Amino acid sequence: IKRKWDGILIMENNKDKKTDDILEKLVHINRITKVVKGGRRFGFSALVVVGNQNGKIGIAHAKAKQVPDAIKKANELARRNLVQIPLREGRTIHHDIFGKDGAGKIKMRAAPKGTGIIAGGPVRAVCEVLGIRDVVAKSLGTANPHNVIRACLKALKKQNSPKQISIIRNKKIAEIIEKRG
C-alpha cells in the first residue's frame, strides 16, 4: 500500500505476501459503517488466510479504521490460530469431502497429479496457502467468502488419513489404500 501526498491510499495488485515461511493471502476487504449520534463512522474489515504451504492453515477476520491496519490485525489473528490438516502425498486431500457453514457449502475431491487447483476465489486461496496443488472443488449455496472459507475449513478438518481409518476399522493401512480409486 502506498500513500499519495494528499492522503489517498493506493492498493497494490499483489494481495499475497510471504514472510518467514508463512504465506498470507487477502481474501476480502469490506467497508463497514457504524452509525453514531453525530453521523456515520467508516471503517474496514479484512478476511485473511495464512498457511505454511505444508498442511498448516489459519483464517481470521478483523476490523480497523484503515485498510492496512485491518489486514495487519487479521494476519496476526490468523497466525495465532493455525491448525494442521493432513495432506495426501503433500499435494492433495485424502478423499472426497463435504463441508457446510451457514448457507455456504463446499464439495472437494482429490485429483490426480498435474490437475491443479480447480476452485473459485476463496477456496483457491485456502488451497494455495495450505499447500494443496491438485484438487477439484465446488462452492454451493452462498458466495459469501466468510461462510465459504469456514465451510472449507470444516470439510478439511473432517477428513481422515488412511492411518486414522485403519485404526477406526481395525484393518491394515494397505487394505484401505488398495481400495482407493
Question: What is each model feature region?
Answer:
Residues 1-3:
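Hydrophobic alpha-helical membrane-insertion segments
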Residues 5-181:
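Ribosome-associated RNA-binding proteins
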